A protein has these predicted regions:
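Conserved catalytic-site region of short-chain dehydrogenase/reductase
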Residues: 75, 112-122, 148-153
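Conserved beta-loop-beta element that borders a ligand/cofactor-binding pocket
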Residues: 131-161, 171, 176
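N-terminal Rossmann NAD(P)H-binding glycine-rich loop of SDR-like oxidoreductase domains
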Residues: 1-25
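A conserved pocket-lining segment of Rossmann-fold NAD(P)-dependent short-chain dehydrogenase/reductase
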Residues: 161-196, 200, 204-208, 212-215
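Mid/C-terminal beta-alpha module of Rossmann-like enzyme folds, strongest
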Residues: 2, 202-269, 283-310
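Short alpha-helix in the Rossmann-fold core of NAD(P)-dependent oxidoreductases
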Residues: 84-91, 107, 126, 194
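NAD(P)H-binding glycine-rich loop region in Rossmannoid oxidoreductase-like domains
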Residues: 35, 39, 43-93, 97-100, ...
């Protein structure tokens, strides 16, 4: 099968390319500024952006399927990089190109928590993108992962940095591993996560391509472990530095204040992430297990596979 892929130079995209190539699929990967980190000569790079119809047409020509992965965690409004533009309008552009080029199979990356009444713009725009795809005539599958972990991902890079008592420049030093908690002092609790290994996410996307049971379906995807933020931090600390690190909450109100005054990026977060941290990002993945026929890996054993790379 020849597959057109967006987001191929990213964290998840790199893993998906490796999985596609390992299964002898041919790949046309849309590449903007950054080159690919996987695939070698087995992948054809197509220069362009989500909003370049000529590049999309060139990349999709002769393809049997599209895997659309592009997404952002933080906005850069001064550069026009917003959730609305990338998640929603970018998806419209790719879906329209698939229809225009007769590529009917479309596997789409969304996010666990995407819904019309979401508290964050991140999830709202993910849901709107889903709705546009669902209204098309394409043979679509939507996958909504929880937090994706693995080597090369920004989240685990930050986790490892905190485990080593470091923080992004110019802060430099972080004596504890932080999370956002409710209440005046932050000890009022926070949401749970269901981390899923990037290799399992890649496997799911490639499996979906020729699994007819998945057409017209939305899948929630997470690992078997539902963890609080302190549990996740301590597990990472143990794997990375050999001991459980000190974990401390930052009150939600303080996180929002830091975001408002521009300090948050120095600590590696934004306002939407503060808001989302208070919700459970967990799901029942029974439907995924039934239709895909396998279980995602637990967090700690998967983490130990790559902890030395962090």
């Amino acid at each position: 099968m020849r597959v057109f892929l967006t987001g191929g130079s990213g964290f998840v995209g790199t893993a998906v390319i490796e999985e596609l190539v390992a299964r002898n699929h041919s790949v046309n990967a849309l590449v903007n500024r950054h080159g690919l980190n996987a695939g070698g000569g087995a992948v054809r790079e197509v220069k362009g952006s989500l909003f370049d119809p000529a590049a999309l047409d060139e990349g999709m020509r002769g393809c049997d399927a599209v895997i659309h992965l592009v997404g952002i965690i933080m906005e850069k409004c001064s550069r026009g990089v917003t959730f609305e533009r990338i998640h929603y309008r970018g998806t419209i552009s790719v879906v329209d190109a698939a229809r225009r080029n007769g590529v009917r199979r479309f596997v789409h990356m969304s996010a666990l928590g995407a819904r019309p009444d979401a508290v964050s713009e991140y999830h709202k725009t993910k849901y709107r993108a889903e709705q546009y795809l669902r209204g098309s005539s394409l043979e679509w599958t939507i996958i909504r992962p929880s937090l994706i972990h693995g080597p090369g991902g920004e989240f685990m890079r930050m986790e490892a940095m905190w485990a080593r008592k470091r923080a992004p420049f110019p802060v430099g030093f972080m004596p504890f591993m932080p999370y956002f908690g409710a209440g005046k002092l932050g000890f009022g609790g926070a949401g749970k996560l269901q981390p899923v290994y990037v290799k399992d996410v890649a496997r799911a996307f490639v499996d979906a391509l020729d699994n007819r049971r998945t057409v017209g379906e939305v899948y929630l995807l997470g690992g078997p472990d539902q963890l609080t933020w302190p549990q996740l931090h301590r597990t990472v600390g143990q794997a990375v530095v050999g001991k459980r690190r000190w974990v401390m909450p930052i009150p939600v109100w303080a996180g929002k204040l830091y975001a408002a005054i521009g300090v948050a990026p120095l600590l590696g977060f934004n306002r939407d992430q503060v808001i989302m941290s208070q919700e459970d990002n967990t799901a029942d993945i029974t439907k995924f297990r039934q239709d895909f026929g396998w279980d995602p890996q637990p967090f700690e054993p998967a983490l130990r596979e790559y902890a030395r790379q962090l």
